[in-house]
Amino acid sequence: MTEFLKLKKSNCKNCYKCIRNCPVKSIRFSAGQANIVGDECIICGQCFVVCPQNAKEIVSGVETVRVLLSGDAPVYASVAPSFIANYNGAGIESLQTALQALGFAGAEETAIGATHVKTEYERLLAEEGRDILISSCCYSINLLIQKYYPDLLPCLADVVSPMQAHCLDLKRRHPGAKTVFIGPCVAKKDEADHYQGIVDAVLTFEELSGWLTEAGIAIAPGPHAESDESRARLFPTTGGILKTMACAQPGYTYLALDGVESCKAALEDIRNGNLHRCFIEMSACIGSCVGGPVM
């Protein structure tokens, strides 16, 4: 996989905080430096959050997006609904105006894709014989299961993430367009890279804020318009997926878990046969996406 989290060796002061806080112990200390083991990393960004020396660096997508904007194809932004927590007082219309000033053709909330995803979850739960179903929205959780619980992959919903669902929808409605996801998550960069042709680039809120500041563009406060996808705006909060779903399957339990340790505990319970007939919403970040590493 492409490395989207890198170490600035000159900044590392050997404090071991990243090693102690990595939930899957994918950081090794060698030759006087902490090193991320890519094949074991789930890209949760916790090492980036806890590093006091700014020795962890997220690879920026700004130049990639600049290249897209310089081309002939229109570029549309899919904006994670957690932007409300990052850009206080701004609605999607205000954010779209700022993005259009950068050269984007338009911007929409990823909640449009989330609506499609929750419908697919409801359909899967209605299938006869369904036992455990785990949400597939959080790419770090998907990687956790793929790398550390591969025997539980049949439990992971075979449904694209809201990011992919929305960008596929944008490309269907705007043939030939390019798509850029903007959100609080570094793992989405790897997801976009892994599933080529759906999401053409990913920016974090931090990258977008820096770019707007550099360009002298301010996001004006504005109302948050109601839409058919308003309930799907709950997706980035803990339990948000469940709040959008019709949780009515008889005999089913619906759980919402956030934080890698809580999710690992549940996965161990599933592996040991202690959980049955459950839909489990899992998020790697405590607080779900609104607690993302790059808010």
List the predicted regions and their residue ranges.
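Iron-sulfur-associated redox domains of electron-transfer enzymes in respiratory
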Residues: 59-295
